[in-house]
Amino acid sequence: MRWARQAVAVNGMPVDDGALPGLQRIGLVRSVRAPQFDGITFHEVLCKSALNKVPNAAALPFRYTVNGYRGCSHACRYCFARPTHEYLDFNPGTDFDTQVVVKTNVAAVLRHELRRPSWRRETVALGTNTDPYQRAEGRYALMPGIIGALAASGTPLSILTKGTLLRRDLPLIAEAAQQVPVSVAVSLAVGDPELHRDVESGTPTPQARLALITAIRAAGLDCHVMVAPVLPQLTDSGEHLDQLLGQIAAAGATGVTVFGLHLRGSTRGWFMCWLARAHPELVSRYRELYRRGPYLPPSYREMLRERVAPLIAKYRLAGDHRPAPPETEAALVPVQATLF
């Protein structure tokens, strides 16, 4: 059996029903480690709801989200969702990367919610918190059920991912697009292979994601690209952005969204610890940029806008397609609205 060697444990030890009160609150069934996913523990839970209503939705292109996972093995050091793991009594650093909560019944619960007479078939965004095509999806395959439920109910959907596992579902996504409006977006903001390995260690390579863009287009779907977050002094040079947007255009993307890094909550400390270790010469500059809060100052955003706008025009990446941005206030503070 494929999972015959799996162990039900947390940190290599049998589960103690009282050891993880945060998980118990959200319906823990069991915790599993498998040799195919070395270093990752999956915490299987039974969720009571699937649809999440977004606060302040008037400022976003969607009002509802579905997230089948909490935590993410992509391990992006800048991930804004890291603080959400603290509610589960995990830390927002390595625990966020290795302790992944799986809502095993999410598709069934979603189908029930979509049958309610009160459901108005508003757009549902997938991938706004943690990546729906992270490694866990290879084991649990939650997305086919989620996509199928939304399409069958007549509900428009959007998908945002760094995960090349989306290729598996391209026939299903293309079929769904015949029934309801569907938008697909790939996140790709780091073109340098060495920096990618350091700052997004669990994600597919930039080249693999470029190939994913091409595959999405070959399936007859538009593909937007989220060039975000742009990292000050690391990925914001004209040379890097020119090369990256050129590659994205060559891959067949229909448009891009560009905005800079924001650092809030415990994500700020996690990222700054990495920066001090990997690029100590940049620490003072980042402290200055973020001294007033989690967002880059207007002067920086204007600089980035002026740098990016000509490149978007050069590579004809100003498509009208609008993907669902991350479920965060950063979506309310873009580089420039015209880049969306």
UniProtKB/Swiss-Prot annotation:
UniProt subcellular location: Cell membrane
Domain Radical SAM core: 58-307
Stretches that traverse the bilayer: 140-160, 243-263
Keyword list, A-Z: 4Fe-4S, Cell membrane, Iron, Iron-sulfur, Membrane, Metal-binding, S-adenosyl-L-methionine, Transmembrane, Transmembrane helix
Lineage: Bacteria, Bacillati, Actinomycetota, Actinomycetes, Mycobacteriales
Protein name: Uncharacterized protein Mb2609c
Residues the entry annotates as binding [4Fe-4S] cluster: C72, C76, C79
Membrane topology value: Multi-pass membrane protein
Subcellular location, principal: membrane
Pfam families the record matches: Radical_SAM
GO MF entries: 4 iron, 4 sulfur cluster binding; catalytic activity; metal ion binding
Cofactor entry: [4Fe-4S] cluster
Species in which this protein is naturally found: Mycobacterium bovis (strain ATCC BAA-935 / AF2122/97)
InterPro entries found in the cross-reference section: Elp3/MiaA/NifB-like_rSAM, MJ0683-like, rSAM
Cofactor note text: Binds 1 [4Fe-4S] cluster. The cluster is coordinated with 3 cysteines and an exchangeable S-adenosyl-L-methionine.
